[in-house]
Amino acid sequence: MNKNELKPAVVFEQFAKINEIPRPSKREEKMIEYLKNWGESRGLETKVDETGNVIIRKPATKGYEHLKTVILQSHMDMVCDKLVDVEFDFDKDAIKTYVDGEWLTAEGKIGRAHV
């Protein structure tokens, strides 16, 4: 399997875009801007509060307005940890990933996930 075969494709395409954005803790400005632009470009109500939380609201699909609201929450930063012998600048470098068997792995083993 290669990265282009990961499903659902739209999720992994978005994941690849996010991996291009350096976002160590306390320095999430680029990620905040990316998410803000993402919401606004889709015509969604988008705001950033005074502490840097990005809130994107999507109206219910027609016919589902009576159902409970769904909230998705996540942190924007990443844990900046790597092997000692790996050169990686968490303030500047994009995360490069590849598929290793059943694992999506970052070069330098700075992260991995079962696929």
Model-flagged regions — what are they?
Residues P24-K68:
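A non-catalytic alpha/beta surface segment that caps or lines the substrate-entry region
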Residues I21-R23, K58, S74, G108:
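Short glycine-centered, acidic/aromatic-flanked micro-motifs in structured strand/loop junctions
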Residues Y64-R112:
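Active-site metal-coordination/substrate-binding segment of hydrolases
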Residues N2-K26:
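N-terminal capping segment at the start of a domain
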